[in-house]
Amino acid sequence: MSKSRRLFLSMQGDDDFWGNGDRLEEKKLPSIKQEKSKVMDDEDLEDRYYFKQNKLGRQQSESRHENEENKVSQEEKWNLRVPLEESILIKKEEPVPEMEESETIIASEEEQLLETSPSVDTNEEFYNNYRNYFQRRPEVIFLIRSMDENAVENYDKEFIDLYEKTRKSLEVCPNPELNQILRCECSSNTSTANSDNRLPNNHAVVVSNFREPDRRLGRYSKYYYHHNVGPEVYSRKVFVGGLPGCVKESDILNFFSRYGRLQVDWPSKHFGCKSDSDPSVCGDATSSFQQTSHLAMSSPPFGQINPFMSDHSTTSSETQNFGMNRNGNGGGVITHGMVRMMNAARNAGFGGGEPRSVGGESSEEKKQHHLGYVFLLFEKERSVRELVSDCFEEEEGLFITLESSIEPIRVQIRPWLLADAEFLMDFNVPINTKLVAFIGGVPRPLKAVELAHFFEQTYGNVVCVGIDIDNKFKYPRGSGRVAFSNYDAYVQAITDRYIVLDHEDIHKRVEIKPYFFHNQSCEECSSRYNRQYAPFFCPSLECFQYYCEPCWHKMHSHPSRFHHMPVVKGI
């Protein structure tokens, strides 16, 4: 693997960032072409040998048919040479003509059978051989499976690979007899099957690396599962949508706790954070007054390092916080007044009790009500796999029936596969770190292969696409990266700055900026033995390079470059 690809795949600073990503064995193009050519040559030899055998069989059957016709003609001539005396004697006798008529009828029937039977036998042998030959051919298997009503379930990886292999072999070494037979027999059936199974797509892109689409839209992308051949590994964070307002957090916990320990979270649940869908926003520093979680004091609130700790850690942390002075120095002694303050705070709703109000429902409970969707934070990845196995699949996605206290409710489950966080369009194209664009505002359900499909259609020359995921749950942050192989395509994307991402039911404007890499050296003053750290990057086409602080001021002191704005990490 080249240095640029390693840098691109490890830019998050987490070793397990890419999940089961780039694990395929790298092979060189000449070796792959040689193997393909050998396989195709073997297949061509088999086809030629088979057709030669068929020609020999036809010649033998024709020679037999000619010999039998000659025998029949000789017998007819011999019958015509019968003397006239025998014919006169036969006419005189009355019962004899009936017998002769029956004999002549039988003889004519036997002759007809002799004429037809060899041809029928030879044809049956020929067609039986042909059927046996074509039943094992992969292209005929493809046609049979495409005409089947349950063809959607048969689109697996082995089948698609087999189809691609045979299609390429037919394109490189065409066989006119085979193609003519396939067109004559299956043209009508394949047209009807394709009209039913393959719907038109307005966003189709003709790319050699895109495989046959997988029609299971619930779990996978509409493009075939592209690069990961290992086991499916899910994020421990699962989106649950379609929740009515009558469903409470306790109902959600009671239902989903059968799969394992979990927490329920949604944006604005904890007012100390902007959004809990991105754990990096919260950080490790939480507010001094945190609201209770659903585990009833068995785990601290969302955002801490280990959300599944015991109650002793929370109480000890609370006592330490109350034992600290304003300056941050520990007093070391917990007085009786401090204990009463702790109990009062807990009863007020900051520790473990529910907030009380005179009117029944308090304002804090209103703030903590979900917005029609929640996030399930499971302790183990196995729980997510069990949840996915219990869901039923439809065209819109995965669904499960939530058994609440009021009535059963159909809710949507949206898991995230770690392999969907990156997509390499071509393993043989090197990645230029200067041609990587940052994509902000990416919808979280969007997969890397779908983002690559969109940018390939819009700008072209896409090499690699990555979705930014958090380090804790491996869930999408809402941003991504696109690496281009062409400078013009990259410049066009950067100059557009904003573009509307229109993909199926997603319609959102995303932002495109140059991606800033850490630990880059100044390209103006750094040499082989003197590396100067470059915290600035100039995206203008006049500069388009990394600068250290002195070089930035030096190169942008000219009035023509005053308007250049630097790109800094985190801004």
From Swiss-Prot:
A Pfam family recorded for this sequence: RRM_7
Kinase found in the keyword field: no
A cellular component term, taken from the record's GO annotations: nucleus
Record field: compositional bias (Basic and acidic residues): 61-75
A GO biological process held by the record: negative regulation of cytoplasmic translation
Domain of life from the UniProt record: Eukaryota
MF term (GO), any: mRNA regulatory element binding translation repressor activity
InterPro entries for the chain: CEBP_ZZ, CEBP_ZZ_sf, CPEB, Nucleotide-bd_a/b_plait_sf, RBD_domain_sf, RRM_dom
Role, per record: Cytoplasmic polyadenylation element binding protein that binds to and regulates the translation of specific mRNAs.
Protein name: Cytoplasmic polyadenylation element-binding protein 2
Biological classification of the source: Eukaryota, Metazoa, Ecdysozoa, Nematoda, Chromadorea
Gene: cpb-2
